[in-house]
Design a protein with these regions (language model features):
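N-terminal helix-turn-helix DNA-binding core of bacterial DNA-binding proteins
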Residues: 2-39
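Beta-hairpin "wing" of winged helix-turn-helix
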Residues: 51-62, 69
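Basic, amphipathic "hinge/linker" alpha-helix immediately C-terminal to the N-terminal HTH DNA-binding motif
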Residues: 63-82
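Short linear capping/connector segments at secondary-structure termini
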Residues: 29, 61-64
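Basic amphipathic alpha-helical segments that dock to polyanions
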Residues: 43-53
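Short, contiguous hydrophobic alpha-helices characteristic of membrane insertion segments
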Residues: 1-2, 57, 103-104
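Amphipathic alpha-helical dimerization/coiled-coil segments
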Residues: 79-107
Length: 107
């Protein structure tokens, strides 16, 4: 596992679920999830860290707006983290997960 914070992993997940999101799109989603305002001074340095570590690429949407895309390295990190997380979820909790909570039906 890489040395990512929980906040950075949450950003990766958000970026993976959106189509070339702009920084403001990512900010809107993370604020919804956390239920609080996220300051730009927290968001953008963490996005830059994800770019520097090769998990995300940053491109220009227009002259003032950046967009973010997950790299293969970022996809691998998400898969590894989800696999690790899943290994610690008790079977009785796994059995209760449905399409609406996980995206797939479990037995």
């Amino acid at each position: 596992m890489n040395d990512l914070t929980g906040f950075q992993r949450d950003l990766l997940l958000i970026i993976s679920g959106l189509d070339e999101p702009k920084g403001l799109d990512v900010n809107e989603e993370i604020e919804k999830y956390y239920g609080t305002e996220i300051q730009h001074g927290r968001l953008y340095p963490n996005l830059d860290t994800l770019v520097e570590k090769g998990f995300v690429t940053k491109g220009q949407h227009d002259l003032r707006t950046n967009m973010y895309m997950l790299t293969n390295h970022g996809k691998d990190e998400i898969k590894a983290h989800l696999s690790w997380t899943w290994s610690y979820i008790p079977d009785e909790l796994k059995a209760g997960l449905t399409d609406s909570t996980l995206g797939t039906q479990t037995q």
